[in-house]
Amino acid sequence: MDLVKCPEHGDACFLKTGVRDGPNKGKSFYVCRTNTCGFVQATDIPVSHCLLHEEFVVELQGLFLPQDKKEWRLFFRCARTKAEGKQWCGNVPWRQDPNPKELSVTSKPQQPSESQLHSPSQPRNPFRVLNKNQKTLERKQFVEEGERKTADKKLRENNEQLLDQRKEQKPKSNSRMEKDPSSDLVATRQSGGDREEQEKSKFQPKTKKAEGMASKQGHGEVLQGIPKGPHMSESESRGVPNKPETLREKETQLLVPSVPGQNPESKVQKEGHVSREPLKNGEAPSAQVTQRGLAQGPLQGPSKTWRPVPEAPAAPELCSGMAHHATSSSEDSEDDGVSSRPGSPLLFDSTVDSQKKGSLQHSDQSVQRQMPAASGVSKKGDSSDPAAQRANLTTQLKQKKGTLAAVNIQALPDKGEKLLKQIQALEDALSALALSPEQGTKEKCSAQEPEQSNITKAAAAPLHLVPPQPLPRPLIQPASSLGLKAGRQETPEGASQCSGGHMNQHHLYNVWKITSEAIDELHRSLKSCPGETAVAEDPAGLKVPLLLHQKQALAWLLWRESQKPQGGILADDMGLGKTLTMIALILTKKNQQKSKEKERSEPVTWLSKNDSSVFTSSGTLIVCPASLIHHWKNEVEKRVTSNRLRIYLYHGPNRSRHAKVLSTYDIVITTYSLLAKEIPTTKQEGEVPGANLSVEGTSAPLLQVVWARIILDEAHNVKNPRVQTSIAVCKLQAQARWAVTGTPIQNNLLDMYSLMKFLRCSPFDEFSLWKSQVDNGSMKGGERLSILTKSLLLRRTKDQLDSTGKPLVALPARRCQLHRLKLSEDERAVYDIFLARSRSALQSYLKRQEGRGSHHGRSPDNPFSRVAQEFGSSVSQGCPAADSQRPSTVHVLSQLLRLRQCCCHLSLLKSALDPTELESEGLVLSLEEQLSALTLSKVDVSEPSPTVSLNGTCFKAELFDDTRRSTKVSSLLAELEAIQKGPGSQKSVIVSQWTSMLQVVALHLKKNRLTYATIDGSVNPKQRMDLVEAFNHSQGPQVMLISLLAGGVGLNLTGGNHLFLLDMHWNPSLEDQACDRIYRVGQKKDVVIHRFVCEGTVEEKILQLQEKKKDLAKQVLSGSEGPVTKLTLADLKILFGI
């Protein structure tokens, strides 16, 4: 790698090597460090392999020149480290100066082997391995170099401590340390003025220099554990152990900031040993710190050896405390510090307080001196008074307990054992201090004893800590967070405790580890999953026998309630009897509960003392749309033996608000809208659903009950996790959670995340983790989604075959009949006028999007005001605001809507649009536009005009009357008459997305003496169920009129076998849902689906668009035909023929 600088920013560029399959695999490019810079320069440097992970290719390299240094260092990262979300694998000295003109001194190779590796004849690539022997040599050299650097660093650190202690005590030039009775170690201090002067001249300038550098940086960083290779002097080499230590690779290393002004006494002691860690797996040139003991140095006896101490990753909250130890070694700062100039990305800063630096050793020593006598640490040399010690220990204890309260210890690799030991040690020290008030006097008597004795003894004697005691439950974070929310906890001042960005390296590793564990757990649970042929017996008390696929589903449901998380998603196709399957589950668990009721000795679930839920119920809470609340009640009453299940409808103004009463019922049924009104949804950042409800939340009765299970019917109603309904549902408490929906994914994978959040499927109920680990568009994310769906979701379709090759459900035949119609001459003339206007509006909109045709002085064409004026209404003329500049997207979509209405009936052009219909179209109108739309239905009737002028063309006014038969209405009536004359008793269902169109059809049905009933949004749930029952009865009405939105879900209209779709919608799943109202379990007759399409109109284009959307939706989730409801510009061009 050569030094290539960006011509724009002047910074040294990174060397990027392609590792993924594609045209750039194996090729290398120089790229600028700045993300927004587009500088790229190709190079012919060959592919390299990582020194730490030999089987992986190095994909990123970078040159960094540490501040006040003349030796460049080359940082490298391989594909494995990048996949783990870390920054660098490590770094090596760059032996040859990449820019000799800029640097006055060229770094020379220190060993012949290294110079051979980087000879000028080879490419400038320190990782290139030509054969196996050379690779082994280079790795060995990398390891040995790290050992020399670590030993060098330890010696300088301890010498610096010795010098600072001498300064504090002002020792004589010739002095000896007395052997302490409580220690077996005898340490001698070097004597002689020459030796002392030599040490002072060696260490003092470096200390001052490092302090100055840290203060200049403001937030200077310290790199510890990075292998480096300066020459060691004779005096330094004396402290190097004879036998080199092997390089230890940690699985993770903390990215530790130094928080300004924080108490350095929060440093976590490591039992007096030195932990030496090399840089691994991409911990960046950032402030990585390995913890060291304070008093390991050349003063120890020869029998003592340097040995590393295994160290578990600490919680993010511990970072700030450990960071201060980085300032105790100024030599590290000088040798390893990387310049924090603005041109160096990947680096973050931390402030070093010079006063903290001076007092750090003393405060850290006091931590070990304050341990109780049982720890084997002598307190003789402690000159501080007991009050100061007590205050010091109390402060540390509060910090540790605060950390414990904020961290989910179960997510830590050591399960929080280290933190618990520290808390126990601090509590013991406080107890010992309270029992020995005369300790301060003893300390004063021995104040003249050299302080180094205590330091040495404290470091040499390992701490014997009392085993951790069990913690009270309220201190433990709920298990659903799994440490992820704790990883983003912030200090009271609002500053993040872990620098390096919102997702720092330790948190990224935590995310990766927890995700892997959760996926592995789900994968292991599949081993106990019942097979496709496994069935469960019909529960006692069920009046009707279950079909085979329902018995198989029941076996799966019972299995899921024994797994974690308890519950899942039942996503069977619409019409396969999901309601009866869930009723069978409730009845089965009810029977099991009766048989085990006497044996149960423990509560159903654990409740904390701060939890407002005081009633544990064995019942089931069912949440459904208001249109289905009576449907559920009727299904239970019809399918289950009387008095088996007690049902309560939590709905209406007279509902019971006593949680204790509700907890006694077997089934409580309520609606989504009622939940959203009753349950407060003010959600704070990082709040766990259902944990510690707010004060106002205690007034909601449904929150005061812990249910045996919650069932969300039509669960796609909570597909948006940010809406009030979704948040309220997630706050409910239950042992098992079920989502029942025929379309688990309607728009995108965010719909699936909403269900994961409701199921509390940790850790995938955390949005940031969901986006980074599942919904990231990668192959690995797709694999994780596949594991989730296999474990948590059961879906069968009507056309699915069982193991024997037979259909899963025996349903009658279904055929679709497409009626192609031609508009009459008058209808075609009106349609063409609207088409020309719509096409012009879209073209001008496209020009504005492209930046070519922005006409600021011209108001856009408002279709509502234009049509209102043409039908004789002058009200819109009094609303100049309606003609002001509006978003063109609204106008284009509204023009498209009017075009589709032209194909159905021209009278729809005069009627106002229902707000729910506008919402389904994706239209959000301003108040002026809504008022303008209302004027369409208020035509002046006092002076009726015989003609209507549209764009200069006059048409007869009777053409727009609702009493006139349009082409589509005429074809519909002809089909209905043919059905009435056909064999047997056949009924029809007519579906339209516009209630105004249903009113026009009803008018003509009445003229033809056909009985009908209408279900739309204005019909209350009780009347709706009565109409459904009447229609399914043989003596009921012949025709049922339903709106696409209000009647598209949850209705069982098996009494009819003909379904007419009057208009086309680009959301095909809405139409499929409507078709499933008649084509479902219980249908005995052959089903015919009638579609009307007017030739040469926008409806033909919509039909093509529907097929495209269906093909895309099938690729999202197997069997899930979820739509994409938004129209793109490409779609609009197709619809308007542009």
UniProtKB/Swiss-Prot annotation:
Domain Helicase ATP-binding: 559-762
GO cellular component: cytosol; spliceosomal complex
Keyword Zinc-finger found: yes
Subcellular location: Cytoplasm; Nucleus
PANTHER family: TRANSCRIPTION TERMINATION FACTOR 2, TRANSCRIPTION TERMINATION FACTOR 2-RELATED
Stated family: Belongs to the SNF2/RAD54 helicase family.
Name of the protein in its database record: Transcription termination factor 2
Encoding gene, per UniProt annotation: Ttf2
